[in-house]
Amino acid sequence: MVNSAVAAAPAAPAAVPWGAVWGQDEAVATLQAAASDPDSMTHAWLVTGPPGSGRSTLAYAFAAALIAEEGDEQAMRQVLAGTHPDMTALRTEGVIISIKDARSLVERSYFSPSLGRYRVIVMEDADRMVERTSNVLLKALEEPPERTVWVLCAPSDADLLPTIRSRVRTLRLREPDIDDVARLIAQRTGADLSVAEQSARHAQRHIGMAQRLATDAAARARRDAMLRGVLAVRGVGDAVEVAGRVVAAATEDAKALTAERDEAERSSLLRTLGIAEGAAVPPAVRSQLSALEDDQKRRATRSLRDGIDRVLTDLQSMFRDVVMLQFGRGAPADGDLINRELEPELRAVASTWSVERSLVVLDQIAETRRNLEQNVAPTLALESMLVTVASGRIP
């Protein structure tokens, strides 16, 4: 049985929402042709693209086109709400996709569609599969039932095993232009175009993150303070202090993102079990509450790690700007700097550091990301990286 990691797809309008897949006309045309022409159909797809490029949105639009007959608004809404019996979506709340969840998807893939033309299995974050989990999918991807379609989503095809890549048709999404993202964000949120442009630039074209920055002045301020704090690191003491602040801020952000949902899930489960809020939980049902709490802990861990990963992405962009300045690029007119607002500080760093030191720092940021994937404590990983920022040497 698929556990709580299998979640509903995002809500969307009744018509096939191809228009919501912004700036990906070629990919949309490919999937529209596949949905309407059996000769263009492939039964296992991999949609790749940078974060925020619309991978999941495209996958759900494709599922809606495959399952719902034209004009069947009820079926369309069910698919996009994740309630259609022929639609299964896996959105993992953990750091990795479990073998249990993968096996559950494989079992469902062998059911014939009950109402629609196809049964569609969407796996978001397919890059979170470890090798053993990937192996569970191999036969289902190679020899799927005639009316089952798999759609995997990942940042890059390199994030999946060659044995998976060889069994899917890859569709690569392009990275949108910053100006186009800015116009979209301004249109969606009503934000001033200059704020939308800054947010799109800082988010490095990630539409969802750009939208958050454009609508949250506090988030913009935290990002700016974090970058300035890192530039001020001069020694081990500073590295320890700044790493602690960064992890604390990421932890608070993670709590804010998950706390309301956690409480709503707990209240819903208690109501389902017939237990009044605040009443003692009978021993017979404590295991169900414990299972929910375990799921929530995994989600909190992933949310924190995602927050730290965003910090590393921002730091990578800043020291990339330093390298650009060292190579004589980065004038505001040519649009090379991501963090233009820090240009004076970045020029000061570029003039005092060697290119080799800047590249060592960028390498250490990448190494920090790998360390976090190996479950190194975030504070320790960041401290080590910031010592490199201060000294120019890997500790």
Where are these regions (language model features)?
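Charged, glycine-rich active-site and insertion segments that engage polyanionic ligands
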Residues: 1-65, 69-77, 146-147, 155-311, ...
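Conserved alpha-helical scaffold flanking the Walker A/P-loop in AAA+ ATPase domains
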Residues: 32-36, 99-120, 128, 132-139
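Short loop/turn elements that form and flank the Walker-type P-loop nucleotide-binding site
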Residues: 40-41, 80-84, 114-117, 144-147
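AAA+/P-loop NTPase substrate/partner-engagement loops
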Residues: 73-98, 158-160
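Flexible beta-alpha connector loops of hexameric P-loop NTPases
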Residues: 93-100, 126, 170-171
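Conserved catalytic/switch belt of AAA+ P-loop NTPases
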Residues: 110-112, 135-152, 162
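A short beta-strand-to-loop transition that corresponds to the Sensor-1 phosphate-sensing loop
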Residues: 124-125, 152-157
